Each structure stands twice: as C-alpha cells, then as structure tokens.
C-alpha cells in the first residue's frame, strides 16, 4: 500500500531549510508542528494555529517534552488570520483539514475559513516554497472543502505554481493531498 505520509515528507523535505519559517496551519495534536520544528532547526521558526484551546494545550505539552528547540509559536486562532502573526515568507506550510484526532468530531475545519487560509498561505509562500494540504472527504464538510480547493488549485497560474494531487482513486473516502510548489 502507498504510504501517503512518507510521500508527504519526501515532498516537503527539499523545501525545508535550517533557519527557515514554516507554518502548521492546523496544529491538532502537534505532529506536524514537532516535525517542522526539528527540520527548521534552532534558528528557524514554526507558527502553529488551532481554534481549539485543547489542541494548543496538547501541543504545548508535547513540544515542551519532545521539541529539541524552542523555535515555535503556538497560536489559538483561526488559520485564516495567519498573516496577522506571520510576517516573513514561509518555506513550507501544512494543512491537515478535518477534525482534531481524539477530539469533538463536530468541530471541523470549514470552507469559509479554509479557503482564505489557503489563499493567505499562497501569498506568504516564498519562491520555491511548498504547501501540503491534506483533505479528508469521508465527512460532508471535508468533501465540500476538497471540491472548493480543487477549484482554487485548478485556477492557479501555471507559471507561478505547480500543483499535484495525490489520491488513491479506488478509495474515494480516503484522505488525499494537494502538493503545491511556488515556482517564482
């Protein structure tokens, strides 16, 4: 079976650099926040967003216990307000849409904030930077987010962005990924 998580990291690694700025737009339990922190190193910076205080608290505990560097800022706010906090161009951004693993499945990312958040991420992205957007179509809002993002990514100018979609086509409810690289 394809290991989509491994493919995700293989895509992002060439774009991550020591001293770079990275954003985890959907903090959750802090898995991506921790990984990004390790990759950008002591002189880099990671910003992580979540609207749920529970997610921020879990991630804070995890980072305190496991992060090798104090190079992160955890923000309890919507990812669509990222530009209020992140001022430098970013080398990598990650979105894991859906709901907090182990949390209330009634609280999910929403099209109304996901679309402006992704648009903000695209403007923050440095040349040769990369975004990864994981979509979970197994619930209605996830399916609708995926459709909206397909429209957005299909409309991006090819000279400025390269966009791929990694999907297991015979498993329609399986998570899939958009991989975006800024060309210029």
Placement of each model-derived feature along the sequence:
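Mobile active-site "lid"/loop adjacent to the S-adenosyl-L-methionine
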Residues: 94-117
